[in-house]
Curated annotation (Swiss-Prot):
Name this polypeptide is given: Acetylglutamate kinase
UniProt cross-references to Pfam families, sorted A to Z: AA_kinase
UniProt EC number: 2.7.2.8
Record-listed substrate binding positions: G46, G47, R68, N160
Molecular-function GO terms, alphabetical: acetylglutamate kinase activity; ATP binding
Catalytic activity annotation: N-acetyl-L-glutamate + ATP = N-acetyl-L-glutamyl 5-phosphate + ADP
Similarity comment: family membership: Belongs to the acetylglutamate kinase family. ArgB subfamily.
Length: 260
């Protein structure tokens, strides 16, 4: 990949944390990109670890329209699982691949503004871009920020933010190219076949038909929002697929392109 000024924002799902080989492969790809002058910013979820920790503490996981409901009593556990354990597992994999990384959250460096998204969801946040100084400094050093989706309101209250939405906001903030990586190769049609490209109308139709639902609906809508805001396609792809990672490292299109 040729050196360019655009930041590649990689959003990784929680399932990656349970696949050591997948993490190693992804970090090796990121290391090669960084060595080639590409700035890389990683944003992560950690839903599976959150679910485990909640269950261990006798609490249940509740979701509303694909988004995690976060009661106040669950916030310390969710913050620990995301900003703590998940973040450090990824940082460990990055270190192993020779990447200098900075573990951070949305609360760091005055990076975003946060507010309650919807009272029905509890302490779930909605964030908007605020100040890119901190991120741009880290990236300018050739380091890779690894950002969890825990944000903070002005009164110090922690909020849990959907990681796809967090990645969208950070991509907007740094003017980056967004790739949403999950454990599926992209958006699949009703027959399980990969859809190479989608626009807003096609997405709305597939949501209405129930083909795109729950977590993938949140993911695709976040991708569409950033595609429209930045006037460029956003990719939904898989960290499981080695060929997609190789193509990604070369700057090629992978998975499903969400068109503005």
């Amino acid at each position: 990949m040729s050196t360019n000024n655009s930041v590649l924002v990689l959003k990784v799902g929680g399932a990656l944390l349970q696949c050591e080989m997948g993490m190693a492969r992804l970090m090796d790809t990121a290391a090669a990109m960084i060595a080639n002058g590409q700035q890389v910013l990683m944003v992560h979820g950690g839903g599976c670890l959150v679910d485990e920790q909640l269950a261990a503490n006798g609490m249940e996981t509740v979701k509303l329209e694909g988004l995690r409901v976060t009661p106040p009593e669950q916030m310390p556990i969710i913050a620990g699982a995301l900003a703590g354990t998940s973040n450090k597992i990824l940082q460990g994999a990055a270190t192993k691949a020779g990447i200098v990384s900075i573990g951070m959250s949305l609360a760091d460096g005055n990076t975003v503004s946060a507010k309650i998204k919807d009272e029905r969801l509890g302490l779930v946040g909605e964030v908007s871009p605020k100040d890119a100084t901190y991120l741009k400094f880290i990236l300018s050093q050739g380091w890779m920020p690894i950002c969890s989706s825990i944000a903070m309101m002005d009164d110090g209250q922690m909020l849990n933010v959907n990681a796809d939405q967090a990645a969208t906001v950070l991509a907007k903030l740094v003017g980056g190219k967004l790739v949403l990586l999950s454990d599926v190769s992209g958006v699949l049609d009703g027959k399980g076949q990969l859809i190479p490209s989608l626009n807003g109308k096609q997405i709305a139709d597939l949501v209405k038909q129930g083909v795109i639902e729950k977590g993938m609906k949140v993911k695709v809508e976040a991708a569409l929002e950033v595609a429209q805001w930045m006037g460029q396609a956003v990719q939904v792809a898989s960290w499981r697929d080695a060929s997609q990672l190789v193509a990604l490292a070369k700057g090629e299109a992978v998975g499903t392109q969400i068109q503005p």
